[in-house]
């Protein structure tokens, strides 16, 4: 690992940096999002994780960015994931309990959301969205799987996320 990379990304462990670059993310995109290595229980708790989730430290911390350009929430990728109850497969990503769904948009792509002439990619997962961003594509990452385009209203009804009001879709090429 070169000295310059460590200087640019001082809050990211070499293992986490290697994982991200192996997933086709550039160091600029990694730095702009603010990926970080979280090594302690306290660091995970301050990001909204439950006590059970916080015990999974160390983890890759993934800040989430909303359609208005605000950092709003976190997703975590524990180094040693816990098994899902339903099928015992690893739960690779953790989202703090109670955190609401949002359309995640890399900070460098915020200004392109309202331009219907810019092609748009919609994908499941921040890392995939950031890989597209690393290659110049405007991408929205859905949180919470393929149903991440929607949320729940105060009465428990399923509704489209209000974030969609910031995304121009008229005549836009969307994948």
Segments and roles (model prediction):
Residues 1-64:
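Short, small/acidic-rich helices and loops at N termini and domain boundaries
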Residues 45-173:
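Phosphate-handling DNA/RNA-contact segment within nucleic-acid enzymes
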């Amino acid at each position: 690992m070169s000295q310059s990379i460590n200087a640019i990304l001082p809050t990211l462990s070499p293992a986490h940096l290697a994982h991200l670059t192996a997933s086709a993310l550039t160091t600029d995109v990694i730095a702009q999002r603010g990926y970080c290595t979280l090594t302690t229980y306290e660091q995970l708790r301050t990001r909204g994780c439950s006590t059970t989730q916080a015990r999974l430290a160390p983890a890759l911390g993934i800040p989430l960015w909303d359609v208005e350009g605000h950092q709003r929430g976190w997703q975590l990728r524990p180094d040693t994931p816990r098994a899902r109850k339903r099928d015992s497969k690893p739960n690779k990503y953790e989202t703090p309990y109670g955190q609401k769904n949002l359309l995640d948009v890399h900070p460098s792509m915020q200004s392109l959301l309202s331009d219907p002439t810019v092609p748009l990619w919609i994908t499941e997962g921040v890392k995939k969205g950031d890989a597209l961003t690393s290659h110049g594509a405007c991408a929205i990452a859905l949180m919470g799987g393929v149903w991440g385009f929607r949320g729940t209203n105060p009465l428990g009804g399923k509704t489209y996320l209000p974030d969609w009001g910031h995304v121009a879709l008229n005549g836009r090429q969307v994948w």
